[in-house]
């Protein structure tokens, strides 16, 4: 859950967001982006770093943490085909860090083949994976008398939130 957008932010808030479950003392230098608590983003990760506003060095202030969160988020704003989350998140797919997929209303993620899932949550994913679907996820339809394809294939644990109107 993102930190507040304004007002007071405490060191305990930082620890709760970026070191969940920890009761250890806080060293502010651990909270630089690309430090030990706020992971770097791999070059082949197509998602948005939810803590991109946090500096990697130099002066750091609690206000740098406004509206930041622990994790990477990829938002579908246009239709897409044959999506594999290991490709979306690149080398960060195997990193123990939260990952979020958002499919906006009116957007369709679909398959072009009955042998390929529209959205593949491939094996090897680490950290929590949450998919919030306000659009559509469709497998490829089969030919007459034949089976259709898979819409969502989960080989790694994930949470799917289907919002009202989603398919």
Sequence positions of predicted segments:
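Glycine-biased low-complexity/repetitive sequence motifs
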Residues: 2-167
């Amino acid at each position: 859950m993102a930190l507040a957008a304004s007002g007071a932010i405490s060191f305990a808030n930082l620890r709760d967001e970026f070191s969940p479950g920890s009761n250890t003392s806080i060293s502010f230098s651990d909270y630089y982006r690309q430090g030990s608590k706020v992971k770097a983003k791999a070059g082949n990760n197509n998602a948005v770093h939810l803590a991109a506003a946090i500096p990697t060095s130099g002066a750091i202030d609690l206000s740098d943490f406004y509206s930041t969160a622990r994790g990477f988020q990829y938002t579908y704003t246009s239709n897409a085909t044959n999506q594999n989350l290991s490709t979306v998140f690149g080398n960060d797919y195997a990193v123990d860090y939260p990952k979020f997929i958002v499919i906006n209303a009116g957007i369709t993620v679909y398959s072009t083949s009955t042998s390929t899932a529209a959205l593949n949550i491939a094996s090897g994913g680490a950290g929590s994976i949450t998919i919030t679907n306000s659009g559509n996820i469709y497998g490829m339809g089969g030919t007459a008398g034949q089976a259709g394809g898979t819409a969502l294939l989960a080989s790694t644990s994930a949470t799917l939130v289907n919002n009202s109107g989603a398919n």
